[in-house]
């Protein structure tokens, strides 16, 4: 009678296999062939070494018994896309037939049907609902296409080997069971009697396999590790591995395994971290070939084409090929976002950048916008090699796409690019050799049957391990039961997760570490630990579980003996306040930086680190060049000072400017939009009475498109229509009693109120028949909530009163009645704010106090941050990164400093609310 052995892989099942092999060899001779069928090639390698004393053992996997030509997975997805598109337009799946995920779902469901040996006819006979009938018809189309192209699996009939052992399987689909039945194993070793393995055990019992009583071994007591997130969890796992090696002489890295449920969550993070720490590693799944520099080169070239030569893509590709940092500055200055036409029209000067871009155009011309897969592959590889690509595995991976012409042709360049990404991501290169001295890293499925001295299991949180278990969206479990008992039930995945957890915890010979990230790195919200941990630890609830775990803080300061790298070594040493010489050895800036931070945060008084100039040389330069008595200043600059003195210091004294990315603009910048409105209105009024608004708009739009940054084309077209309508509305609402007489009137060095000498440009000056004048300042932005008629708004609304005074100087023979902010756009709410001459006379003392305060603070070098929480000027400030995230707390500590008393006093009510 065939023998069935039950038990855990280690130590029972593996020991039973060793005994069975020895018995077989003793009975049939040392050279008698013995076949052993296992789930993975890695397990075959492990058992080969374990059974090294025996000769003529032939390990095989199910992949060694092909059932016919295998269609490429990406080809099946293309076939699924085609079938999805051909579903009835009025059928059950009509609402989702164009969705991206339907093709993948169809192929997954059809694969389950095939593995259950279910023919299209059998499916159609059990299809009792419109949904099932539609799905059965699609399955018939799928199988028909595969049959016509010789891809449909055919039952293989291999000759049974003289002797075969089946080792390590706990689940087999119908097709696999049929194969095993034909191979007629004489002994089967099943690693579990858990519920998930019961269907296999029942099937083996029907074949007269007699099970042995499983031997139970006590599980290795686990250590628990709770880390704040995946990056910290990975580092702690590595730290645990190195600590184990330190404490266990004679152990090697390959005696340790770091395992996880799915590759998506940890694979890249572990690769990057272990590479950074220079730790030898064997990644069971290998490394994606997409990480090779030549693969990156190929994908960057495709991204350049996909984005129509966007500035970002072109510069990234250029940077990959060499150092061209000056190209970044040049393209910003030219306002290049992308597009072949924009490169050609704006990049006039000969030079290496223009040569490079023209070369890209020539290479890109070798790839059509659409075509057969083979043509696209040929064109891409030719361009790639021209750019320096050489790595043969990259070329071979791309060449496999040529076979997809059978499934769908032609395809667009966008589809081709997508599939290039996929084939390079899924093609893997070996990373280290198994048990060759490197740390073993794998997903749990790939490590089945292996054992290690230390096993560290990562990601034990809900939705990771156990993975989310969901029914097939196309074929529910209830429908699967109706169709065939051979179809797998998706909700049985819960049992598989329990089984996998049992297997992985049993794979630790000496020490088991169970780890989970307790915080979501994106939201910092707590995560729920896996319910699998409760059974493994005996904890009654998650609160008790956390008490059992080693709790890694968010920012740990560690003992130096546990440091993984210099930074972790230096931090605890710095906590001990070492000498300046030690700090200097770490970094020449460290001592000064720590001293500045301590001085800034330990004092309630303002310091030189808060915007107070105290150095005599700095003050001398300030008095020489930047005090108001030496400047001809704009009203906007003065408003900036009262917005925040530190902002004024950065913008107008240090001249610090943000380095904007042209492509970051979704639409035209607010400053450019304002200038465009100004130019259009100036042209219109200057050409009166024969002005053609339509022609003026067209000319200005064309001029800006040639030189400025318009953002996305569709949004720009919408913005142009808005400009047309808002300009037309403004002109229709014009008061005929006021006639424009001056446009964009420049003035400079006008002493309007000592010590302020003003410069600026008045958008428009209107006159009435009685020789009264008014000043208009166009506003195209959003209306500021704190603006009020005849109000300085704490110094943040000085333009109207100062322009009113300037107009009086410019037109001494006329009466300047008022100055107005004219918000004439939808964003501005069509509001008008005015400042009258009468109000200005009444507030003359207040204006002088404001200007005097600014002059005195600048003279004293007081440029402290003004950062109240309410109505904060920090929200959209370009210099927020300089101030840091703690600026509001710092302001609360220091706003009572005497240096800011007068400033807060003239700011008025708003400052009082936040002081």
Feature map (PLM): residue ranges:
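ASCE RecA-like P-loop NTPase motor cores
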Residues: 1-34, 43, 51-52, 68-74, ...
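Anion-coordinating catalytic cores for phosphoryl-, nucleotidyl-, and glycosidic chemistry
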Residues: 2-61, 205-828, 834-904, 908-909, ...
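Basic/charged alpha-beta structural segments of nucleotide/phosphate-handling enzymes
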Residues: 38-159, 174, 325-351
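Short, charged, surface-exposed secondary-structure boundary motifs
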Residues: 66-72, 197-201, 290-297, 468
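Structured, non-catalytic alpha/beta "coupling" segments that mediate domain-domain communication
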Residues: 101-119, 188, 604, 632, ...
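Conserved helicase NTPase motor core
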Residues: 120-206, 226-229, 233, 453-454, ...
């Amino acid at each position: 009678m065939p023998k069935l052995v039950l038990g855990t892989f280690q130590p029972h099942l593996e020991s039973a296999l060793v005994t069975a092999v020895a018995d077989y060899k003793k009975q049939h001779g040392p050279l008698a062939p013995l076949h052993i069928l296992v789930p993975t090639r890695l397990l075959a390698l492990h058992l080969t070494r374990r059974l090294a004393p025996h000769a003529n053992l032939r390990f095989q996997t199910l992949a060694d018994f092909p059932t016919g030509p295998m269609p490429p997975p990406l080809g099946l997805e293309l076939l699924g896309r085609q079938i999805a598109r051909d579903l009835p337009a009025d059928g059950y799946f009509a609402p989702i037939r164009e969705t991206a995920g339907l093709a993948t779902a169809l192929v997954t469901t059809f694969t389950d049907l095939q593995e259950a040996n279910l023919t299209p006819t059998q499916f159609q006979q059990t299809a009792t609902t419109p949904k099932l009938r539609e799905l059965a018809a699609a399955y018939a189309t799928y199988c028909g296409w595969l049959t016509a192209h010789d891809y449909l699996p055919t039952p293989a009939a291999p000759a049974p080997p003289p002797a075969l052992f089946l080792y390590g399987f706990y689940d087999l689909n119908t097709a696999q069971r049929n194969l095993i039945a034909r191979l007629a194993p004489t002994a089967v070793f099943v690693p579990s009697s858990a519920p998930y393995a019961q269907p296999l055990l029942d099937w083996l019992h029907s074949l007269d396999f007699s099970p042995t009583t499983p031997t139970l071994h006590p599980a290795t007591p686990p250590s628990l590790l709770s880390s704040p997130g995946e990056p910290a969890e990975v580092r702690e796992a590595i730290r645990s591995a190195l600590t184990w090696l330190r404490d266990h002489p004679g152990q090697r890295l390959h005696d340790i395994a770091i395992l996880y449920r799915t590759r998506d969550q940890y694979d890249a993070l572990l690769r990057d971290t272990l590479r950074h720490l220079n730790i030898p590693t064997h990644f069971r799944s290998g490394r994606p070939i997409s990480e090779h520099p030549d693969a990156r080169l190929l994908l960057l070239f495709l991204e350049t084409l996909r984005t129509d030569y966007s500035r970002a893509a072109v510069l990234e590709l250029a940077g990959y090929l060499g150092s061209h940092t000056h190209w970044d500055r040049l393209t910003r200055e030219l306002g290049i976002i992308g597009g072949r036409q924009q490169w050609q029209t704006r990049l006039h000067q000969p030079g290496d950048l223009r040569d490079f871009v023209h070369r890209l155009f020539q290479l890109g011309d070798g790839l059509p916008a659409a075509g057969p897969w083979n043509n696209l592959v040929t064109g891409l590889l030719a361009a790639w090699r021209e750019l320096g690509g050489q790595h043969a595995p990259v070329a071979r991976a791309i060449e496999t796409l040529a076979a997809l012409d059978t499934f769908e042709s032609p395809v667009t360049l966008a589809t081709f690019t997508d599939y290039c990404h996929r084939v390079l991501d899924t093609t893997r290169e070996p990373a280290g050799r198994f048990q060759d001295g490197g740390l073993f890293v794998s997903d749990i499925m790939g490590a089945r049957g292996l054992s290690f001295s230390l096993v560290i299991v990562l990601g034990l949180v809900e939705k990771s391990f156990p993975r989310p278990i969901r029914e097939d969206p196309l074929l529910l479990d209830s429908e699967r039961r109706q169709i065939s008992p051979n179809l797998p039930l998706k909700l049985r995945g819960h049992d598989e997760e329990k089984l996998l957890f049992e297997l992985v915890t049993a794979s630790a010979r000496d020490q088991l570490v169970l780890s989970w990230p307790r915080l979501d790195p994106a939201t910092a919200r707590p995560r729920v630990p896996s319910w699998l941990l409760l059974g493994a630890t005996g904890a009654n609830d998650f609160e008790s579980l956390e008490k059992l775990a080693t709790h890694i803080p968010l920012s740990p300061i560690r003992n130096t003996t546990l440091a993984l790298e210099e930074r972790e070594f230096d931090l605890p040493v710095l906590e001990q306040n070492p000498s300046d010489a030690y700090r200097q050895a770490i970094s020449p800036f460290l001592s000064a930086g720590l001293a500045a931070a301590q001085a800034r945060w330990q004092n309630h008084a303002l310091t030189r680190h808060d915007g107070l100039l105290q150095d005599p040389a700095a003050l001398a330069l300030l008095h020489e060049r930047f005090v108001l008595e030496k400047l001809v200043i704009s009203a906007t600059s003065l408003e900036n000072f009262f917005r925040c003195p530190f902002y004024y210091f950065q913008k107008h004294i240090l001249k610090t400017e943000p380095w904007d990315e042209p492509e970051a603009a979704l639409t035209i910048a607010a400053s450019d939009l304002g200038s465009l409105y100004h130019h259009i209105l100036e042209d219109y009024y200057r050409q009166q009475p024969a002005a053609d608004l339509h022609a003026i708009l067209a000319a200005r739009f064309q001029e800006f498109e040639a030189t400025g940054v318009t953002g996305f084309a569709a949004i720009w077209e919408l913005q142009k229509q808005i400009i047309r309508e808002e300009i037309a509305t403004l002109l229709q609402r014009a008061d005929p009693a006021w006639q424009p007489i001056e446009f964009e009137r420049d003035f400079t060095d006008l002493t309007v109120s000592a010590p302020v000498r003003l410069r600026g440009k008045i958008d428009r000056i209107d006159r009435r028949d009685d020789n009264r004048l008014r000043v208009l300042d166009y506003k195209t932005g959003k209306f500021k909530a704190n603006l009020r008629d005849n109000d300085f708004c704490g110094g943040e609304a000085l333009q109207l009163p100062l322009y009113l005074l300037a107009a009086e100087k410019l037109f001494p023979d006329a009466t300047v009645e008022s100055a107005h902010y004219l918000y004439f756009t939808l964003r501005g709410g069509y509001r008008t704010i005015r400042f009258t001459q009468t109000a200005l006379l009444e507030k003359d003392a207040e204006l002088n106090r404001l200007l005097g305060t600014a002059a005195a603070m600048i003279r004293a070098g007081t440029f402290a941050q003004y950062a109240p929480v309410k109505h904060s000027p920090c929200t959209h400030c370009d210099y927020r990164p300089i101030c840091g995230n703690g600026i509001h707390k710092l302001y609360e500590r220091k706003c009572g400093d005497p240096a800011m008393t007068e400033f807060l006093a003239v700011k008025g009510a708003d400052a009082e609310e936040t002081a």
